[in-house]
Amino acid sequence: MSMSSIPSSSQSGKLYGWVERIGNKLPHPFLLFIYLIIVLMVTTAILSAFGVSAKNPTDGTPVVVKNLLSVEGLHWFLPNVIKNFSGFAPLRAILALVLGAGLAERVGLLPALMVKMASHVNARYASYMVLFIAFFSHISSDAALVIMPPMGALIFLAVGRHPVAGLLAAIAGVGCGFTANLLIVTTDVLLSGISTEAAAAFNPQMHVSVIDNWYFMASSVVVLTIVGGLITDKIIEPRLGQWQGNSDEKLQTLTESQRFGLRIAGVVSLLFIAAIALMVIPENGILRDPINHTVMPSPFIKGIVPLIILFFFVVSLAYGIATRTIRRQADLPHLMIEPMKEMAGFIVMVFPLAQFVAMFNWSNMGKFIAVGLTDILESSGLSGIPAFVGLALLSSFLCMFIASGSAIWSILAPIFVPMFMLLGFHPAFAQILFRIADSSVLPLAPVSPFVPLFLGFLQRYKPDAKLGTYYSLVLPYPLIFLVVWLLMLLAWYLVGLPIGPGIYPRLS
């Protein structure tokens, strides 16, 4: 069945069809990044030959593009090829997480858990459930981007709905809403530190706390859950039509063995969480900062991903033994090998992606583009609401081409934070604008390592899906999320509500 079932007379149907056709003409991601590397090399050579540079408005230093085709570029590239690949942070994190999450899936824990959760939810509200769980999963940082999409598909299968709709709803929650959190997470810590440093250029006493965006971001979870659910139910799933997959994939009932396994896994989960809590909650807890005894930052926050992997391993092992999925010691490595095999295509794709990102950074093209575009926005004299929209759109554009959100904010914050402070706005308010833009376009960013991962998840249920298919399906979420989120922030600003404890959009 075609993914695009809206009649051709529908303008939205024509748009999705156009996106799918254009996207499907794109080469395989591996080749796409090879071509991008060639374009990048030629571009740096031309800009370098003509001595083109940009002036950093914060300190007046020139931002010069370095020539990748020069002798200097060759001397940098050859010794760093392997380092660029093996040191690519998302690759390390994703492969490690797949060991844990893949084991949980292979022993049957995740499917059984999703069936258990879905059994208490009416199929009508499955979209909202998936989105809410996805938002809550942000506590696991990038791990959520790996774990939640397959979970979303399984939940929809369990309630008899189209798994691709559940997959896309989960991608929207963990991707488009990546920085919307009920709890304080690592993103708050990272971005607030960058904002504080940027604000110091204007006011050395200004400090952006990790909780300065909390009220707005927690409220965003509620709004975006409703919006995302409506998009899934009213736009996405009608386009997919009736699920024609194997009926055996509809996980509708649990065996007594699975129920027993879930009970054992639940007990082990509680014991694991209690053990971690004993190392974090007490003031002298061993996972707190050894000097300041704080939770943020602390070894606990820095080690959240390894702890998640260990959690999956321990709980999956308990479930597997209880259900006799794991009968011998040799079963354990075999169960962990299978999900790693599925990552082969992702690993191959990451090689040119990692080289492209490293070359983009070394050549200063990222800084050059960011400074040039921000100069245009600054020189146009935009202020107030136009400045809000300008920063959001600029950030969205840059996030499409630079994989690291923190890297982009490191470039933009020294320019826009002082600029917004001069206009009378709190730096935490500028930070929210960036977070909205960064999150909204994450599932679309061609340089994101998660896009091919999401495509791989989609191909489980639609083997002939290509990049264009993926883009045409996921497109409504980024577009609508960005507009709704900005309107929500505008309303927040006009009403004068606090964006965090004691923090308002405008400086007092």
Segments predicted by a language model, with ranges:
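Interfacial loop/helix-cap signal at membrane boundaries in integral membrane proteins
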Residues: 10, 14-15, 53-88, 201-209, ...
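Membrane-core helix-loop-helix motifs of multi-pass transport proteins
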Residues: 20, 149, 153-243, 250-258, ...
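Core transmembrane alpha-helical segments of multi-pass membrane transporters/permeases
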Residues: 26-34, 38, 62-111, 297-366
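Hydrophobic core segments of alpha-helical transmembrane domains in multi-pass membrane transport
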Residues: 33-48, 97-102, 133-137, 173-177, ...
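Interfacial/capping segments of alpha-helical transmembrane domains
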Residues: 46-74, 187-190, 284-292, 363-372, ...
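Membrane-interfacial loop-to-helix junctions in multi-pass transporters
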Residues: 72-73, 85-91, 118-129, 163-165, ...
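Hydrophobic alpha-helical transmembrane segments of multi-pass integral membrane proteins
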Residues: 94-95, 122-153, 158, 347-356, ...
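C-terminal transmembrane helix pair
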Residues: 121, 366, 380-507
